[in-house]
A protein has these predicted regions:
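Catalytic Cys-His active-site segments of thiol-dependent hydrolases/isopeptidases
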Residues: 113-122
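"Short basic amphipathic alpha-helical interaction patches in structured regions
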Residues: 107, 118-119, 130
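E2/UBC-UEV (E2-variant) core
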Residues: 123-136
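Cysteine protease catalytic domains with a Cys-His-Asp triad
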Residues: 1-102, 106-112
């Protein structure tokens, strides 16, 4: 077990095996890394943009049965987050595509949406869903 002292973020050595060459990245490692990015921002807010990092389950829940904001509404409340999501400069949304991870970014600061895929894939469904979510 590895623990990040400042944030109470734990991860097992077994989960970290996915970082070896040729291994498949898992959701636990992605969620831990996103948590560490948020912790870094909290510790030094003057150095970083205000960001929100959704966990790896968010997009799947948002899109279950089509666009379904109700299924994630509680994840986005100011009470739950401790800050207003709409005041963030960037909102990061990890997306799992069967055996591949992509990242969508709602970049409010620059007023654009980004879809990042190391395999240069495209998903015409992602952007309309995120536009609907951003217009909440």
């Amino acid at each position: 077990m590895v623990t990040h002292e400042n944030s109470n973020i734990d991860i097992t050595g077994k989960s970290l095996q996915c970082l070896k060459p040729g291994a498949w990245l898992n959701d636990e490692v992605i969620n831990v890394y996103l948590g560490l990015l948020k912790e870094r921002e909290r510790q030094e807010p003057q150095k970083f943009l205000r960001c929100h990092f959704f966990n790896t389950f968010f997009y799947k829940s948002l899109t279950r049965g089509g666009y379904n904001y109700k299924s994630v509404r509680r994840w986005t409340s100011q009470r739950k987050l401790g800050y207003c999501l709409l005041e963030c400069d960037k909102i990061f949304v990890p997306i799992h595509k069967e055996v591949h991870w992509c990242l969508a970014v709602i970049n409010k600061k620059d007023e654009k949406f980004q879809y990042l895929d190391s395999l240069r894939g495209r998903d015409p469904c992602v952007m309309p869903i995120l536009v609907s979510f951003a217009d909440m």
